[in-house]
């Protein structure tokens, strides 16, 4: 998935980057995510936030100071910035855990925000990856746990192949977690939705096939 990607480093739990950004990528440090960048020798192209977590705006040549009272979270503002610059793949680190569980939920919702704009986002935790798809499909390869949730009302045409529990052209809703506690059962698995959006979680050792 390398090439022209936007990395967003937030203030939640951070366990290092799975891939190293290259010159065509864009790295945004959101608030206290700047400290993770500094400690891990990651050079951000942009630092933004209201800096309520960091305490003060850092000394950086490209800082955007946001107001404390605003509609966008720092992460959402970072996503909007990346979209405006033409990036379609978003790798979000430091977006889970931390002291604010509300921000974890907000960041999961942000994956749907990205998918609604025909882009893809991945939210990395210590042992898992979260992503969202809309009216599309993904292929997974590897071993481990997988979970699939409807995150936006009703999802139709949901097909799960290559998993322990499969579905074929099913309809699932956001008020019942039918897709929890699944796992890879074949070398490759496919998750598809023809009408709606899905939130997908898979173990960190599982990869997506292009």
Regions found by a protein language model. Give the residues of each.
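A contiguous pocket-lining binding segment that forms or flanks enzyme active sites
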Residues: 112-145
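N-terminal beta-strand-loop-alpha-helix module at the start
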Residues: 1-57
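Short Gly/Thr/Asp-enriched flexible loops that form oxyanion-binding sites at enzyme active sites
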Residues: 101-112
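Short phosphate-binding loop-to-helix
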Residues: 63-85
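General beta-strand structural signal in soluble alpha/beta enzymes
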Residues: 9, 28-30, 49, 64, ...
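Structural motif
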Residues: 9-13, 95-96, 202-204
């Amino acid at each position: 998935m390398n090439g022209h990607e936007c990395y967003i480093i937030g203030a939640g739990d951070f366990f290092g980057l799975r891939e190293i950004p290259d010159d065509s990528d864009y790295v945004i440090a959101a608030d206290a995510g700047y400290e993770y960048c500094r400690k891990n020798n990651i050079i951000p192209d942009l630092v933004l936030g209201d800096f309520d977590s960091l305490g003060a705006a850092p000394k950086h040549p490209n800082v955007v100071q946001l107001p404390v009272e605003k509609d966008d979270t720092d992460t959402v503002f970072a996503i909007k910035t990346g979209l405006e610059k033409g990036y379609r793949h978003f790798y979000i680190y430091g977006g889970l855990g931390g002291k604010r569980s509300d921000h974890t939920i907000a960041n999961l919702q942000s994956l749907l925000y990205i998918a609604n704009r025909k882009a893809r986002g991945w939210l990395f935790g210590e042992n898992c990856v979260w992503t969202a798809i809309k009216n599309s499909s993904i292929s997974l390869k590897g071993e481990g746990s997988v979970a699939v949730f409807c995150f936006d009302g009703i999802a139709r045409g949901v097909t799960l192949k290559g998993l322990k529990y499969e579905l074929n052209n099913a309809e699932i809703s956001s008020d019942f977690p039918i897709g929890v506690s699944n796992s890879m059962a074949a070398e490759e698995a496919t998750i598809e939705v023809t009408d709606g959006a899905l939130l997908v979680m898979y173990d960190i050792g599982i990869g997506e096939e292009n």
